[in-house]
Amino acid sequence: MKKYTLIATAPMGIEAVVAKEVRDLGYECKVDNGKVIFEGDALAICRANLWLRTADRIKVQVASFKAKTFDELFEKTKAINWRSFIPENGKFPVIGKSVKSTLASVPDCQRIVKKAIVEKLKLQSGKANDWIEETGAEYKVEISLLKDQALITLDSSGTGLHKRGYRVDQGGAPIKETLAAALVQLTNWTPDRPFVDPFCGSGTIAIEAALIGQNIAPGFNRDFVSEDWEWIGKDLWNKARLEVEEKANYDQPLTIFASDIDHRMVQIAKENAEEAGLGDLIQFKQMQVKDFTTNLEFGVIVGNPPYGERLGEKKAVEQMYKEMGQAFEPLDTWSVYMLTSNENFEEAYGRKATKKRKLFNGFIKTDYYQYWSKVRPQRKKTENA
C-alpha cells in the first residue's frame, strides 16, 4: 500500500503528547513546532483521525518545495500529479498562510495554487477547454509558506478533531476536548484509580477521562471528510472503525466524579455525558470545591478553575484557590493538577507545585500546576493469583 507523509497538527505545548499517541498507534514520528510528522498508508489516515485524542487535524502532505516567485509556485504546483489525489468532480477549496516569506500575499498564493491545480486536472482529464465541475467530495488544499518553503497539504479531518460529537451544550467558555484529553494524559491516572474534576463546567475533562479509561476512540461518534475520498475507500474506513469497536473496553469499571458550583453547568455536563454514552460512568454533583471530601485513596484531581482575568474577579478567585488548597491538604495520597493563567496560584493554593508545564488554552497562556502524591504501593500478588 502506498505510503504518505502525514501531519498531525497540535496546539503549542502538546506536541509531545500527540507524538506519544502516534507512537502508540505503531508509527514512528518526529516532532516539530505545532505538528507531529509520520509516515503511513491510507489506513493510517483513518486510524489517526479516529484515535488521536490531542491532535487538531490530520493532514496529508502533497508536496514541499522552495518558492520565491509566483511563477515558481505555479509551475511546481502544476507539476504535481493531482489526479492521484483529487478525482474529476472533486471539490478543492484552497486556504493558505505565509510566514516570513517573499510571497506574503496569501490571497494571491491561494489563487495561483487553485489555478495550477485546475490546469493540471484539465490536462490530465483531456478536457483542456471544459469547466471543472466541483460537485463531489471535498479535498481541502492548504498552501503554507514558511521562510520561502512551500508546503501543500490536504486536510483529511474536515471539522477539527476536537469536535467529538457529544457536546449538546457548552455554557460559557469551554475547554477544547483535545486540550482536556491532554490534561488527563499528562497525569499519573490509570482507570483503576478515582478521578475528580471539581470545576467540571460542561463536563469535558471528565468525559475525556472516561473515554480514555475505557479505551474508546474519540472519533467513534463522528464523520470525517476523507471517508468520501476515492483513494482511501469505504473498506479501509470500515476496517478502522471495526478496530475501534474491538479495542474498546466497555467493561472497565471507572470511578469518576465531576462537580461545579453552577447547577446549570452540572445539568449541561450530564446531558453531554449522556450523548457520549457515558452517563452511567460519571457521577455529577453541584458543589463548591471547598466542600470536597473523600475517603478514597490514590486518586487524581484535574481541574480548569476560573482564572480571575476579568476586572474585580481576581481577589475572589484567589480566595477560592486558598480554600481549595485547604480542602485538598489532607489528601496526601491524591495527585492534583490545575490549569490556570493566574500567576499567584501557588501562593494562594498554599504550596509550590511539584512541576509546572506551559500550555495554551486557546490563546491564553497558562501553567499546568502538578502536585504529585506519595507513591502508590504495589499490590502484592498472592500465590494463587
From Swiss-Prot:
GO terms for molecular function: RNA binding; rRNA (guanine-N2-)-methyltransferase activity; rRNA (guanine-N7-)-methyltransferase activity. CDD domains: THUMP_AdoMetMT. Its EC number is 2.1.1.-. Residues 44-156 form the THUMP domain. The keyword Transport does not apply. Keywords: Methyltransferase, Transferase. Belongs to the methyltransferase superfamily. Interacts with the RNA polymerase core. This is Putative RNA methyltransferase YpsC. It comes from Bacillus subtilis (strain 168). The lineage of its organism: Bacteria, Bacillati, Bacillota, Bacilli, Bacillales.
